[in-house]
């Protein structure tokens, strides 16, 4: 009986130690996040470069989907929410449609989506960068314009993904200065 109690106690202590290590890892990853951000943005840009030409050639529209009002939201007090909503918009609405353009495109868009998900996880883990609740009107305008473009919306949104990366960079630069 004593040996089973001792075993349970040792398992408990091991669990406590492991959870402490995870907490330290999470804190360390947040400490190093500002220095790893340029690398993450570089990876996003590299992944996008594999599909950029395809989607920009298909985008025959002159108007911009991602405009200055969205950038202003990214730089202002709604930056957190705008970033969060735009990541969700690309992951849930744009990229699933973008994947429907052949196996090569699907593979590259999927890779791009995974990198964007990784960024989102890191941002959420470090509450300093994504502590938000309010809605962004600029994001709602982007979503509305995207819907109105119907099948052309995916070309427009994907062709402007590099602008989105630039907006992420602008938001993160602002947050790191604060």
UniProtKB/Swiss-Prot annotation:
<dbReference type="GO" id="GO:0002904">
    <property type="term" value="P:positive regulation of B cell apoptotic process"/>
</dbReference>
<dbReference type="GO" id="GO:0045893">
    <property type="term" value="P:positive regulation of DNA-templated transcription"/>
</dbReference>
<dbReference type="GO" id="GO:0006955">
    <property type="term" value="P:immune response"/>
</dbReference>
<keyword id="KW-0964">Secreted</keyword>
<keyword id="KW-0202">Cytokine</keyword>
<dbReference type="GO" id="GO:0002719">
    <property type="term" value="P:negative regulation of cytokine production involved in immune response"/>
</dbReference>
<dbReference type="InterPro" id="IPR009079">
    <property type="entry name" value="4_helix_cytokine-like_core"/>
</dbReference>
<feature type="disulfide bond">
    <location>
        <begin position="80"/>
        <end position="132"/>
    </location>
</feature>
<dbReference type="GO" id="GO:0051045">
    <property type="term" value="P:negative regulation of membrane protein ectodomain proteolysis"/>
</dbReference>
<dbReference type="GO" id="GO:0032715">
    <property type="term" value="P:negative regulation of interleukin-6 production"/>
</dbReference>
<dbReference type="GO" id="GO:0051091">
    <property type="term" value="P:positive regulation of DNA-binding transcription factor activity"/>
</dbReference>
<feature type="signal peptide">
    <location>
        <begin position="1"/>
        <end position="18"/>
    </location>
</feature>
<dbReference type="Pfam" id="PF00726">
    <property type="entry name" value="IL10"/>
</dbReference>
<keyword id="KW-1015">Disulfide bond</keyword>
<dbReference type="GO" id="GO:0030889">
    <property type="term" value="P:negative regulation of B cell proliferation"/>
</dbReference>
<comment type="similarity">
    <text>Belongs to the IL-10 family.</text>
</comment>
<dbReference type="GO" id="GO:0002237">
    <property type="term" value="P:response to molecule of bacterial origin"/>
</dbReference>
<keyword id="KW-0325">Glycoprotein</keyword>
<protein>
    <recommendedName>
        <fullName>Interleukin-10</fullName>
    </recommendedName>
</protein>
<dbReference type="InterPro" id="IPR000098">
    <property type="entry name" value="IL-10"/>
</dbReference>
<comment type="function">
    <text>Major immune regulatory cytokine that acts on many cells of the immune system where it has profound anti-inflammatory functions, limiting excessive tissue disruption caused by inflammation. Mechanistically, IL10 binds to its heterotetrameric receptor comprising IL10RA and IL10RB leading to JAK1 and STAT2-mediated phosphorylation of STAT3. In turn, STAT3 translocates to the nucleus where it drives expression of anti-inflammatory mediators.</text>
</comment>
<dbReference type="GO" id="GO:0140105">
    <property type="term" value="P:interleukin-10-mediated signaling pathway"/>
</dbReference>
<keyword id="KW-0732">Signal</keyword>
<dbReference type="GO" id="GO:0005125">
    <property type="term" value="F:cytokine activity"/>
</dbReference>
<dbReference type="InterPro" id="IPR020443">
    <property type="entry name" value="IL-10/19/20/24/26"/>
</dbReference>
<feature type="glycosylation site" description="N-linked (GlcNAc...) asparagine">
    <location>
        <position position="134"/>
    </location>
</feature>
<comment type="subunit">
    <text>Homodimer. Interacts with IL10RA and IL10RB.</text>
</comment>
<dbReference type="GO" id="GO:0050728">
    <property type="term" value="P:negative regulation of inflammatory response"/>
</dbReference>
<dbReference type="GO" id="GO:0001819">
    <property type="term" value="P:positive regulation of cytokine production"/>
</dbReference>
<dbReference type="GO" id="GO:0046427">
    <property type="term" value="P:positive regulation of receptor signaling pathway via JAK-STAT"/>
</dbReference>
<dbReference type="InterPro" id="IPR020423">
    <property type="entry name" value="IL-10_CS"/>
</dbReference>
<dbReference type="GO" id="GO:0005615">
    <property type="term" value="C:extracellular space"/>
</dbReference>
<feature type="glycosylation site" description="N-linked (GlcNAc...) asparagine">
    <location>
        <position position="67"/>
    </location>
</feature>
<feature type="disulfide bond">
    <location>
        <begin position="30"/>
        <end position="126"/>
    </location>
</feature>
<dbReference type="GO" id="GO:0051384">
    <property type="term" value="P:response to glucocorticoid"/>
</dbReference>
